């Protein structure tokens, strides 16, 4: 089985790194295409067996499984020239949220990875990939997609565009929102003490990491954790009272 990746932006690079690092397929069967060839030349230094090209049609003609990782407005532009070369025995997977594109010849699987799944040897499986298959995707092809992405992330399969949109916000958009929040808090704390922003940022990042671990491992529920930290009329409780008056949609 030949596996092709079209597009080497942030997500295309993330997928390539994980597929290579997790030995998901024989690298002599991995094809990576990008419009700017110089951006992927270094992959030959990682392993000379990897095939690189700037010709998407070459990937369509050669690969049974094709992942298209481009910006959402470019998906149809990239896919249309490939259609004459795609057969019902192939599989198309794309990473573009917010599209209702259909491809009845072999079906489409939409997978929204998260930058949280960037490869890390010490923690090779993290983040959540959101998956939605259309009705034309076979059971075998569904299994392939879910097996691939479960190598380096948790997976959540959804059945409707609305669920895909909301889950995408939670899994794929949220790292940026969290990063901004931590950065803003670090800046505010720096202004009120003698610690540098770098120091306050590290404190917040480590606190976020350890709190996430407690919640993920069900050591405490959110309510239990809050009760462990907050005391009546204390500064934490006063902050919680302010936040609790604002519905989550306004935060």
UniProtKB/Swiss-Prot annotation:
As for subcellular location, the record says: Cytoplasm
State one molecular function term (GO). pyrroline-5-carboxylate reductase activity
Where does the chain cross the membrane? none
Its primary localisation, in coarse terms, equals: cytoplasm
Q: What EC number(s) would the UniProt record show?
A: 1.5.1.2
The organism sits in which domain of life?
Archaea
Q: Which InterPro entries match?
A: 6-PGluconate_DH-like_C_sf (IPR008927), NAD(P)-bd_dom_sf (IPR036291), P5C_Rdtase_cat_N (IPR028939), P5CR-like_CS (IPR053790), P5CR_dimer (IPR029036), Pyrroline-COOH_reductase (IPR000304)
- Keyword set for this entry? Amino-acid biosynthesis, Cytoplasm, NADP, Oxidoreductase, Proline biosynthesis
Pathway assigned to this chain's UniProt record = Amino-acid biosynthesis; L-proline biosynthesis; L-proline from L-glutamate 5-semialdehyde: step 1/1
Reaction equation(s) it catalyzes: L-proline + NADP(+) = (S)-1-pyrroline-5-carboxylate + NADPH + 2 H(+); L-proline + NAD(+) = (S)-1-pyrroline-5-carboxylate + NADH + 2 H(+)
Q: Name one GO cellular component term.
A: cytoplasm
Keyword Signal recorded: no
Indicate yes or no for the key word Oxidoreductase. Answer: yes
Q: What Gene Ontology terms for biological process does this UniProt record contain?
A: L-proline biosynthetic process
Q: What's this protein's family per the entry? A: Belongs to the pyrroline-5-carboxylate reductase family.
In UniProt terms, what function does this protein have? Catalyzes the reduction of 1-pyrroline-5-carboxylate (PCA) to L-proline.
Q: What is this protein called?
A: Pyrroline-5-carboxylate reductase
């Amino acid at each position: 089985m030949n596996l092709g990746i079209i597009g080497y932006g942030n997500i295309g690079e993330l997928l390539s790194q994980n597929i290579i690092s997790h030995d998901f397929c024989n690298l002599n069967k991995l094809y990576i295409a990008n419009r700017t060839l110089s951006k992927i030349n270094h992959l030959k230094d990682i392993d000379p067996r990897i095939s690189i090209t700037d010709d998407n049609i070459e990937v369509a003609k050669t690969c049974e499984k094709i992942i298209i990782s481009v910006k959402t407005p470019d998906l149809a532009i990239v896919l249309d020239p490939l259609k004459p070369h795609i057969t019902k025995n192939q599989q198309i997977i794309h990473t573009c949220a917010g599209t209702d594109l259909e491809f009845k010849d072999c079906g489409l699987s939409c997978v929204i990875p998260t930058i949280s799944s960037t490869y890390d040897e010490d923690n090779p499986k993290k983040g959540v990939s959101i998956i939605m298959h259309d009705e034309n995707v076979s059971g075998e092809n569904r299994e392939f997609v879910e097996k691939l992405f479960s190598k380096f992330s948790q997976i959540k399969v959804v059945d409707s565009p609305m669920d895909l949109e909301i889950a995408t916000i939670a899994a794929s958009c949220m790292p940026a929102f969290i990063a901004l929040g931590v950065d803003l808090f670090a800046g505010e704390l720096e202004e009120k003490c003698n610690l540098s922003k770098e120091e306050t940022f590290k404190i917040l990042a480590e606190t976020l990491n350890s709190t996430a671990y407690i919640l993920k491992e069900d050591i405490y529920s959110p309510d239990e954790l809050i009760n462990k930290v907050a005391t009546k009329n204390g500064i934490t409780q006063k902050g919680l009272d302010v936040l609790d008056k604002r519905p989550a949609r306004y935060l």
